[in-house]
C-alpha cells in the first residue's frame, strides 16, 4: 500500500472509477485534493474509505483523529465517504503464535474507536474492513468488522509458518534451490 499522488497513478484511479465500483483508501488531505480535482475534471465521484492506523505506523490515521479527518474531507465534492479500513501489519513483528492475540486486540480496538467516533458524529459506514493473515481467525467475532482482507491467507508462506499460522504443506508454492557457495558465516 502506498499513496496515490503521481499524475499517472491518479489517472489509473480515474479510469478504474469510471469502469468499476472502485474504492480508494485515503489518509491525507493533500492526496485527497489531487484525486478530487482529477475526479471533478473527469465528471465522476470516487468512493473512499479512511485508513485507520491499527499500530503498524506505516499509514493511516490514529483512531481518535478519524472524525476530524472525515469532517475535513467534506470539502471535496467528488469524493464520497463509504467507511473505514485498516491493516494490522505490525503483527508480523510477532515471533511466536502466542503473541498474535495482542495484535488482534490492537486491530479490534482501533477499528472500534474509529467506528464509534464516526457513528457518534453522524457518519454512516457501509464498509468496515481490515485484515491480515495472522489476525484473521482472532478477529472474526468482532462486532464492527464487516469485510476481511486476510492478505496472503490463500497462499501462505514462510512468515505464516514461523508464527504457526500455516504448515509447510499448506503453502501454495515451494521453491527448491541448490546452494552453490557458502564460504563463511557472513556471506549469504
Regions found by a protein language model. Name each.
Residues 1-93:
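Active-site-proximal beta-alpha core segment in soluble small-molecule metabolic enzymes
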Residues 98, 102-188:
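Active-site anion/phosphate-binding pocket segments in diverse small-molecule metabolic enzymes
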Amino acid at each position: 500500500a502506498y499513496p496515490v499522488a503521481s499524475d499517472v497513478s491518479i489517472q489509473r484511479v480515474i479510469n478504474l472509477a469510471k469502469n468499476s465500483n472502485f474504492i480508494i483508501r485515503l489518509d491525507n488531505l493533500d492526496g485527497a485534493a489531487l484525486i478530487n480535482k482529477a475526479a471533478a475534471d473527469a465528471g465522476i465521484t470516487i468512493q473512499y474509505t479512511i485508513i485507520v492506523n491499527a499500530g503498524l505506523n506505516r499509514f493511516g490515521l490514529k483512531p481518535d483523529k478519524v472524525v476530524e479527518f472525515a469532517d475535513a474531507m467534506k470539502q471535496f465534492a467528488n469524493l464520497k465517504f463509504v467507511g473505514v479500513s485498516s491493516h494490522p501489519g505490525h503483527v508480523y513483528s510477532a515471533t511466536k503464535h502466542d503473541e498474535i492475540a495482542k495484535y488482534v486486540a490492537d486491530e479490534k480496538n482501533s477499528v472500534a474507536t474509529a467506528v464509534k467516533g464516526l457513528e457518534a458524529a453522524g457518519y454512516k459506514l457501509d464498509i468496515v474492513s481490515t485484515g491480515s493473515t495472522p489476525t484473521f481467525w482472532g478477529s472474526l467475532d468482532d462486532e464492527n468488522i464487516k469485510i476481511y482482507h486476510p492478505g496472503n491467507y490463500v497462499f501462505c508462506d514462510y512468515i505464516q509458518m514461523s508464527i504457526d499460522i500455516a504448515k509447510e504443506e499448506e503453502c501454495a508454492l515451494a521453491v527448491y534451490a541448490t546452494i552453490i557457495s557458502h564460504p563463511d558465516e557472513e556471506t549469504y
